[in-house]
Amino acid sequence: MASRCWRWWGWSAWPRTRLPPAGSTPSFCHHFSTQEKTPQICVVGSGPAGFYTAQHLLKHPQAHVDIYEKQPVPFGLVRFGVAPDHPEVKNVINTFTQTAHSGRCAFWGNVEVGRDVTVPELREAYHAVVLSYGAEDHRALEIPGEELPGVCSARAFVGWYNGLPENQELEPDLSCDTAVILGQGNVALDVARILLTPPEHLERTDITKAALGVLRQSRVKTVWLVGRRGPLQVAFTIKELREMIQLPGARPILDPVDFLGLQDKIKEVPRPRKRLTELLLRTATEKPGPAEAARQASASRAWGLRFFRSPQQVLPSPDGRRAAGVRLAVTRLEGVDEATRAVPTGDMEDLPCGLVLSSIGYKSRPVDPSVPFDSKLGVIPNVEGRVMDVPGLYCSGWVKRGPTGVIATTMTDSFLTGQMLLQDLKAGLLPSGPRPGYAAIQALLSSRGVRPVSFSDWEKLDAEEVARGQGTGKPREKLVDPQEMLRLLGH
């Protein structure tokens, strides 16, 4: 057993950890059987990465997993990121609920790691800690005028209409005629779709009451989605594009010039990209049939894709009090395939608008000074989920690989981290002896005046939300105030 541990240790993600003296047996190997009896593991974050990691860890017949969450409610971006008109995507909540109901899994909400309890304190209490807290921030534009009223991140806008407590004060001003979204990914299309969807089509979704009220008063008629590169480089997927093309009451605006010569180029691209580009090409260049032409002619709203444009400045209104447009540099592409990049041509153009939404990516934050963090890439440095130079510390999801991919991508990624952890456990590479787990953390939290929310507490809040939605035909009316949630629970 000792030699097996030794070989693995030499090739691990933790190469600069001090090795045991020659001929000695590390204590974590010596006590392997004790440790394996009841491994105590904690997961930080209850979104898809957290729950899928926990699900895999529970394959160990004795492992106990505690999931800590900053919000009083679970499910992360499934609750706060998935668009309200995509309820089918939220069905994964049923799987996560089954995991939470395991007798060896516990959810503890209303606990902010890094503030209420530190990562070193968690590492003292558990055999292993997995950081799965996602990407809570957005990438800044870093251009003049970004701070003007009328400019916000798509992430904050999504959080606002989905009931994320920290975004409920956003109050976006939708009194303008034109909105510009900087970015051409699925989040950008979600935001455009919500802005242009007739409000009555959202009435039976779980969009918040406040957001629906603001959208009913919206005067936004045109939404532009701006990208630095061309049609072959868009980041959205065909399902979301098809929804936009078929959006009731809205017509697409695509410039055929942007698609010149594209027919030959798409022959060599992978099939999903080819199908997506062909749909764009048809929409831009083919004359619609009579029914579609009539639908577009009667549309009161429009959306368009502006390619080969890079934002340089948010332009202020004459009084300087709010955003009134975006100055764009015209670009051209250099390089091939993955190395293709947009370079400015020297030409500029101004795009008037009253609302600017930045959708150029999410970004993770460092959670604790004791945890390594690559601020440039926005991830925790790791090898297959093992945090570099910190034995017993792991990561999964967006904080592990960056904010890309769909829920299925996160599932695969999280299962891999769980697999690595269980391998290390079996090899005796984690701390030996019993660990107190939640009992120790509960005492710390109690001494600090923090009252965790259990999964059964969440189910009471869930029932309250469903009951509030029934009167208006909604699946639920989300609670958006953490203090109200805690009051309802008697905390």
UniProtKB/Swiss-Prot annotation:
NADP(+) binds at Q184, G185, N186, V187, R228, R229, E240, G405. It is an enzyme of class 1 (oxidoreductase). GO terms for biological process: cholesterol metabolic process; generation of precursor metabolites and energy; steroid biosynthetic process; ubiquinone biosynthetic process. Changing G109S: In MMDS9B; uncertain significance. Its cofactor is FAD. It catalyses: 2 reduced [adrenodoxin] + NADP(+) + H(+) = 2 oxidized [adrenodoxin] + NADPH; 2 reduced [2Fe-2S]-[ferredoxin] + NADP(+) + H(+) = 2 oxidized [2Fe-2S]-[ferredoxin] + NADPH. Changing G437C: In MMDS9B; uncertain significance. It is found in: Mitochondrion; Mitochondrion inner membrane. It is linked to Auditory neuropathy and optic atrophy: An autosomal recessive disease characterized by hearing loss, visual impairment and optic atrophy, with onset in the first or second decades of life. Optic atrophy is caused by degeneration of nerve fibers which arise in the retina and converge to form the optic disk, optic nerve, optic chiasm and optic tracts. This is NADPH:adrenodoxin oxidoreductase, mitochondrial. It comes from Homo sapiens (Human). The gene is FDXR.
